[in-house]
Amino acid sequence: MFPGRRKVSKLMAYILRHSPEEFGLRPDVEGFVPLSELVEALKTIYPDVTEEFVREIVARDAKGRYEIQGDRIRARYGHSFPVSLDHEEDTESRFLYHGTPRRNLESILREGLKPMRRQFVHLSTSKSEAIKTGRRHGRDVVLLVIDAECLRKKGLKVYKAGKNVRIVEKVPPECITLEV
């Protein structure tokens, strides 16, 4: 019997973004690992997982978290270890969004958004997705509006990392306003 798609996807994200070595995987510089090796790693927790099931997870993922190229797979964003990503630059978005617990607001408005334990700051093209993401870290969430033109004027490139996900090195406080 197959485990739930969501449970396997969460494990895939953990392995590909944070801990490939824990499962005996060695990503290349772009974060790719052999798909067959990921399937074997997943089987240590979920023995019934197949390559077809993993491909289905990737195809149905609404956020575009994963990418398969030939017989290799990677997470498209969210890595806590260095990877060289070749994402297309987003030169069109005017505003992007970031949901965060209210307790973080004062420091963000003072210091800006930083990648923390990741390589990039994650932003969304969707207000609702940003709020949903922020709720993973606390219930009382505020919505930050990021002026993408302000980022570009400061020499910061915004990249398309997923369907509605954008990544940037950092977000200076002067590019942030609070959605009221």
Swiss-Prot record:
Q: What is its EC number?
A: 2.7.1.-
Family, per entry = Belongs to the KptA/TPT1 family.
Residues in the signal sequence: none
HAMAP family from the xrefs?
A: KptA
Q: What does this protein do?
A: Removes the 2'-phosphate from RNA via an intermediate in which the phosphate is ADP-ribosylated by NAD followed by a presumed transesterification to release the RNA and generate ADP-ribose 1''-2''-cyclic phosphate (APPR>P). May function as an ADP-ribosylase.
The protein's organism comes out as: Thermococcus onnurineus (strain NA1)
Q: Which UniProt keywords apply?
A: NAD, Transferase
Gene3D superfamilies registered for this protein in UniProt: 3.20.170.30, RNA 2'-phosphotransferase, Tpt1/KptA family, N-terminal domain (1.10.10.970)
- Tell me which Pfam families the record gives: PTS_2-RNA (PF01885)
Q: Give a GO molecular function annotation for the protein.
A: NAD+ poly-ADP-ribosyltransferase activity
Q: Which residues cross the membrane?
A: none
Which Gene Ontology BP terms does the record give?
A: tRNA splicing, via endonucleolytic cleavage and ligation
Q: Which InterPro entries match?
A: Ptrans_KptA/Tpt1, RNA_2'-PTrans_C, RNA_2'-PTrans_KptA, RNA_2'-PTrans_N
User: What is the protein's name according to its record?
Assistant: Probable RNA 2'-phosphotransferase
